[in-house]
From Swiss-Prot:
The keyword Hydrolase applies. It is an enzyme of class 3 (hydrolase). The gene is celB. The keyword Signal applies. This is Endoglucanase B. It comes from Paenibacillus lautus (Bacillus lautus). Belongs to the glycosyl hydrolase 5 (cellulase A) family. The lineage of its organism: Bacteria, Bacillati, Bacillota, Bacilli, Bacillales. GO terms for molecular function: beta-glucosidase activity; cellulase activity. Keywords: Carbohydrate metabolism, Cellulose degradation, Glycosidase, Hydrolase, Polysaccharide degradation, Signal. InterPro entries: Carbo-bd_X2, CBM46, Glyco_hydro_5, Glyco_hydro_5_CS, Glyco_hydro_5_endoGlcnase_B, Glycoside_hydrolase_SF, Glycosyl_hydrolase_5, Ig-like_fold. One of its GO terms (cellular component) is extracellular region. The active site is at E177, E299. GO terms for biological process: cellulose catabolic process. Residues 1-30 form the signal peptide.
Length: 566
């Protein structure tokens, strides 16, 4: 459980009560005493996913998903980063023989065992599962019940036998993100009944397979790994029925959807996005942990990362990860970062975004400080003014600010009034004196605990878009970004109504419908956007992080698109 720190030795009882209420909004629900399995799950923290390798949809782990072949050195380097557990997703579909035996290729099963052993040798807790099989064929269970169940049972019979003598630091997850809609049903109760049948069958197969499997930790997922209350309650009922002390519940979490993909104007880590974390994990805690069932978040991240990690602005993304990590820690829930190759390079063993990893790593031991923004904008050709930001100190104390190793002077270069940090106009003028559009300097802010927070000082001018023509499959607006960065785009028909996909909002999904190409000097409008745009005129509003808004008009006629600058 996360402990709050205070610089005061004595606090009034009223303040103590208020703090406890803030930390435990559902504290009225008394928690069950910690179990051995709860201690096991807490020892797994932090965890990492070896995504898009053995779970590749295809016959070769290196071909279908583009990642290099797993090496022992990779596993050792993950352990060296401080991770205590690893989830190794495995897709079996292309490696299973025909009915009735559904024999798994010996070479593939041995390969899985090899990777598992490397992880165990690195002193990691290890989770293996049945991964993309969930949507490849298990999802057809309603229409192909007997075949799916026989195949599923055969897989787990062979896995259980292969690993029955492995130590208890190896756990089995029954199925990843189980779903059954390909069978024809969308009925929640029917889907839950099929999942319950799979989970119970999995449980019985493993428990009756001998060796260490009689007590091996088993991980059971909600329907689609979703943390909705209905689905968690259903899983709780299944686990209660099984009455086994070595069970772990799992859900996945990718944040409040509009923020996670950058749609509907949710460009910032705001109160609604934060409250989504609070509500979700209060419910997870009260459904499972408080009743003696430990929980691991088997995957977490942001959905926009599937496109690229720049879909969410850097500072906003850091605030999400910081708050998420500390809140689930309060709830005694362990987490496993989803990494399909976008975070930790599997040959150089370097993080693609060291600042993101530093924020995640700092969360393992405490809280980090953040700010209302990580961007300080100075408009070219205008009088520079003092600029203030709000610090989210999170119980910490600011210790220094520096640029390129030179410490800034309090009172001269900046002032700090409680948690309000003000950068003086004289310092901002100095930092942007070269007149280069874009990031001119990075102010590194250090605190007594946690990760550093970096402010990028940006010199910008109003972005300029130019008229152009193109097609629905290839349309790019020539853009002079002038040091600014794009936050979002609105699309509205001139005659009224929202244009493009998700027409319940005028703000379109970043990268899916539009994409800034800074190095090319373009804003690309994607085919997916035009697929749902009528043949008429659309007004676009491009909103930038400086606060600038630039209007643009497009006219679609069949596959032809004409763009006109305002």
């Amino acid at each position: 459980m996360k402990k709050r720190r205070s610089s005061k030795v004595i606090l009034s009882l009223a303040i103590v009560v208020a703090l406890l209420a803030a930390v435990e909004p559902n504290a009225a629900l008394a928690a069950a005493p910690p179990s051995a399995m709860q201690s096991y799950v807490e020892a797994m923290q932090p965890g990492w996913n070896l995504g898009n390798s053995l779970d590749a949809v295809g016959a070769d782990e290196t071909l279908a998903r583009g990642n290099p072949r797993i090496t022992k050195e990779l596993i050792q380097n993950i352990a060296a980063q401080g991770y205590k557990s690893i989830r190794i997703p495995v897709t079996w579909d292309s490696h299973i023989g025909a009915a009735p035996n559904y024999q798994i290729e010996a070479a593939y099963l041995n390969r899985v065992q090899e990777v598992v052993q490397w992880a165990l040798d690195a002193n990691l807790y290890v989770m293996i599962n049945v991964h993309h099989d969930s949507w490849l064929w298990i999802s057809k269970m309603e229409s192909q019940h007997d075949q799916v169940l026989a195949r599923y049972n055969a897989i787990w019979t062979q896995i259980a036998n292969k690993f029955k003598n492995s130590p208890s630091k190896l756990m089995f997850e029954s199925v990843n993100e189980p779903r059954f809609t390909d069978g024809g049903t969308t009925d929640e109760a029917k889907q839950q009944k099929m999942l319950d049948e799979l989970n119970v069958s999995f449980f019985n197969i493993v428990r009756n397979s001998g060796g260490q499997n009689a007590t091996r930790p088993l991980v059971l997922s909600t329907l689609e790994a979703s943390p909705t209350q209905e689905r968690m309650t259903a899983l709780y009922n299944t686990m209660t029925k099984l009455n086994d002390k070595n069970l772990i519940a799992t859900v996945h979490f990718y944040g409040f959807w509009p923020f996670s993909v950058n749609i509907a104007g949710y460009t910032k880590f705001d109160a609604e996005t934060q409250n989504d974390i609070i509500t979700t994990f209060d419910n997870v805690y009260n459904t499972f942990v408080a009743k003696g069932i430990p929980v691991v978040v088997g995957e977490y991240g942001l959905l926009g990362f599937d496109k690229n990690t720049g879909v969410i602005e850097q500072g906003e993304k850091l605030k999400f990860f910081e708050f998420f990590a500390q809140y689930v820690k309060q709830k005694s829930i362990s987490t496993m970062l989803w990494d399909n190759g976008q975070h930790f390079n599997r040959t150089s063993f370097k993080w693609s975004d060291p600042d993101l990893f530093n924020m995640i790593k700092a969360s393992w031991t405490g809280r980090s400080s953040t700010a209302s923004s990580d961007l300080i904008h100075v408009k070219q050709g205008t009088a520079v003014k003092d600029t203030s930001v709000q610090l989210n100190l999170n119980g910490n104390t600011l210790t220094s600010l520096s640029v390129n190793g030179t410490t800034l002077k309090s009172g001269t270069d900046y002032t700090l009034n409680s948690s309000r940090l003000t950068f003086k106009a004289s310092q901002l003028t100095k930092l942007t004196s070269l007149g280069k559009l874009g990031v001119n300097a990075t102010i590194v802010t250090k605190f007594n605990r946690g990760a550093d927070w970096k402010f990028n000082v940006v010199l910008y001018n109003t972005p300029k878009l130019s008229s152009t023509t193109g097609t629905t499959s290839s349309f790019a607006i020539p853009t002079a970004f002038n040091g600014d960065q794009l936050a979002t785009m609105e699309a509205v028909y001139v005659n009224g109504g929202n244009a493009g996909p998700h027409n319940w909002t005028s703000f379109k999904e970043f990268e899916t419908t539009f994409s800034p190409a800074y190095s090319e000097g373009k804003i690309k409008l994607q085919q997916a956007f035009f697929n749902e745009v009528n043949d008429t005129t659309v007004t676009l509003k491009f909103q930038f992080w400086s606060g600038e808004i630039v209007n643009y008009t497009i006219k679609k006629s069949g596959s032809t698109v004409t763009g006109t600058a305002s």
